[in-house]
Amino acid sequence: PILPQKWYFKNSIDYSISLNYAVLNYAARYKDELLYNIYTMGRHSIEAGSKDSWTLYPKRADALSELLKTEKPTGKIDSFQLAVFNKVYKNPVTRDPRGYIIPINQSTTAIQFVNILIKSGIKVHRASSDFMVGTKKYLSGSYIVKTNQAFRPHVLDMFEPQDHPNDFLYPGGPPVRPYDAAGWTPAFTMGIDFDRILEDFTGPFDALAYGDIQKPLGKIINSQYNSYGYTFSTKDNASYIAVNELLNAGEIVYKNKEQYFVRHSDKINNSITKLSTDYGILFTNVTTPLSDTLKKIQPIRIGLWDKYGGSMSSGWLRWIFEQYHFPFKLIYAKEIDSVNLNANYDV
């Protein structure tokens, strides 16, 4: 323990340096054991993903506790406890998946998710032709993530619900908040369509090289016909890039609940072709006016608060705006206090 005293930033730095030296010293002394343990963990993960396995989630521990309260022992207590344990932890329905399949026929966000997996060192396969798993057909180009790999725990974290224990201050009392992030699963938050496969499966799968970042393949459907205009989905995040690029170029963009629409012109045709190629956006050429009511989209004037020296929250929003090509202007306290913001900005 540290006695109460005047504290300087140097003290904190000294603590960090001493900790760094301790870690380096430990690694130097036990390098063989550390490297072998890393290998062993990877081997165990591969073995677990190659057979029926169950993760010991907190919810299953709770289910086991409840079952032990209601089940009555018959015979030896050890045999009874094992039988109850197997009811919960060896239930075939609750097995961990042998792998996940990400169908190719969905939005470009699925490719972004696949790239997250690739960047974190997860082995990903891609189907070279159509294939069947069970009774379901998957198209060529679909992505496959098997769990018989060294980073299996991370694979499960990317696809499975986060399961935190029910931690209460006292029985019947308020819950104790988790120390850190309590519930984010990228496959859920990104809205990815995927299937959990509980049985071992094979197919025409090609392993992607580590670091082989994927690019969505866009196209223009019905491009061979005379064009009245083009539609593209409101459900694809990449569509925001297309809308902002078109608006920034002075084009008129319309939308209804399901799709955006732009009228055909030689200039629009060139823009659509480039957007489809660069960002993998799927456009559909239409030959007649749409029957649905369309609303004209107005360009939006965004003012983004920031402070001199930078702000983490402002920087995050700025990064998001830049990724999807939203025009914005940084505003600081002086401007906020001295001008009519409503006259200069919409949001």
Predicted regions and their residues:
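Intrinsic-disorder/low-complexity accessory segments
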Residues: 1-347
